[in-house]
Curated annotation (Swiss-Prot):
Catalytic activity as recorded in UniProt: tRNA(His) + L-histidine + ATP = L-histidyl-tRNA(His) + AMP + diphosphate + H(+)
Pfam families in UniProt: HGTP_anticodon, tRNA-synt_His
Name assigned to this protein: Histidine--tRNA ligase
Gene Ontology CC annotations of this record: cytoplasm
Protein EC: 6.1.1.21
Family of this protein: Belongs to the class-II aminoacyl-tRNA synthetase family.
Annotated localization: Cytoplasm
Length: 426
């Protein structure tokens, strides 16, 4: 009987063992950095009430209109696989009373879902790392988030390959004033607009500035600038932010048509972009969203955050040939030729793990010839092969072969192995 193979859903990719060590390195780099800054992890459901995203992201957005995985459950309730993390994070904070006269610095990591056209660096299930700071006013916290990003890029090795772009969306009344100016401008060029932009013109014209249609880019660049209608308070806030970037030595450029693709943003917004992935690509984006908590039924609460897609980070590191550098942890492969040697190998492996917690120790438990085991050892990426053959067992010695150099193989007493590793791998 021929059985059809079931494959992964289009745009939802498997991450295989050859890549997971690099993914783990990227994830752990993020986590270590945020812990050093005093941020704490929060976890919330992958599935939420659909209204959560319609209310926060905005109904006239590509995400809500075209990209959300929405369906009715067995009770007839409309639920949605989360397309982004901020709304769920804020919902959890409100529901569990985390914002009552408190400040929260939080991070999260997990899968998000959008029914987009799959392409390089963009998938229907993608992994997002998010950072949110709630209950904190002023530009200092915005500057801290930018500093976190810069440290992440440095730790991952590509700080020279990304650029920071910033803008201000001002207060809601300023955006409303700008909206009228923008609509008038766009109506004067109505014949140029694509169907999506025409549809957005009355309901959410700022979305036109977020269009990726290459035929509209000149029109967008020539559009009136929101920054020109900002009031004194918004100008002062943005100037304070820019001054802080200069004090911290963080290069930036002001992008006057930078708007975030989600309705809840206001005041400072930013993106980190790179030209290493073909056309200019955004690898991280964020900004201030002081109205979001109130949108969801909470008390007015200042908030700011950012998010980045791990697939895009992986792709950038791959392009810059940084993946091997991220996977250079020292490891050892123990070769054992028979049952007695395998038992000795298991004992030795535990001893090494106890004495050297940072070392990865791989033990061959299936026996086999030396040639096949050396192939396995080399393929594993191990630095050293520890060999326990019949001669070694008889003499209670272990032979050691450096798999990455031409250094001659040596033998030492088994009791000296931890001392040897301490010196050799220092």
């Amino acid at each position: 009987m021929v059985v059809d193979k079931i494959q992964a859903i289009r745009g939802m990719n498997d991450i295989l063992p050859d890549s997971t060590s690099v993914w783990r390195f990227i994830e752990q780099t993020f986590i270590n950095c945020l812990v050093r800054y005093g941020y704490k992890e929060i976890r919330f459901p992958i599935v939420e009430n659909t209204q959560l995203f319609k209310r926060t992201i905005g109904e006239i957005t590509d995400i809500v209109e075209k990209e959300m995985y929405t369906f009715n459950d067995l009770n007839g309730d409309s639920i949605t696989l989360r397309p982004e993390g901020t709304a769920g994070c804020v919902r959890a904070c409100i529901e569990h009373g985390l914002l009552h006269n408190q400040q929260q610095k939080l991070w999260y990591l997990g899968p998000m879902f959008r029914h987009e056209r799959p392409q390089k660096g963009r998938y229907r299930q993608f992994n997002q790392f998010g950072v949110e700071a709630l209950g904190i006013t002023g530009t200092a916290i915005e500057l801290e988030l930018i500093s976190i990003c810069r440290r992440l890029w440095t730790d991952l090795g590509f700080s020279q390959s990304v650029q920071l772009q910033v803008n201000s969306l001002g207060e809601i009344n300023e955006r409303q004033k700008y909206r009228s100016i923008l609509v008038e401008y766009l109506r004067d060029h109505f014949q140029i607009l694509d169907e999506d932009s025409k549809r957005r013109l009355d309901k959410n014209p700022l979305r036109v500035l977020d269009s990726k249609n290459p035929d509209l880019q000149q029109l967008i660049q020539n559009a009136p600038k929101l920054i020109d209608v900002l009031g004194d308070d918004s100008r002062e806030h943005f100037q304070s932010f820019c001054n802080g970037l200069e004090t911290l030595g963080i290069p930036y450029s002001i992008n006057p048509v930078l708007v975030r693709g989600l309705d809840y943003y206001g005041q400072t917004v930013f993106e980190w972009v790179t030209d290493q992935l073909g056309s200019q690509a955004t690898i991280c984006a964020g900004g201030r969203y002081d109205m979001l908590v109130e949108f969801l039924g909470g008390a007015p609460t200042p908030a700011v955050g950012f998010a980045l897609g791990l697939e895009r980070i992986f792709l950038l590191m791959e392009t810059l040939n940084l993946l091997n550098e991220s996977n250079n942890k020292q490891s050892i492969f123990i070769i054992a030729t028979n049952e007695e040697a395998i038992l000795k190998a298991l004992v030795m492996a535990e001893s090494i793990r106890n004495a050297h917690p940072s070392l990865d120790v791989i033990t061959n438990t299936t026996g086999g010839g030396f040639k096949s085991q050396f192939k396995k050892a080399d393929k594993s990426g191990a630095r050293l092969a520890l060999i326990l053959g019949e001669d070694e067992i008889a003499r209670e010695y272990v032979s050691i072969k450096d798999l990455r150099t031409e250094i001659e193989q040596i033998s030492i007493p088994m009791t000296k192995i931890n001392e040897f590793l301490q010196d050799y791998l220092a």
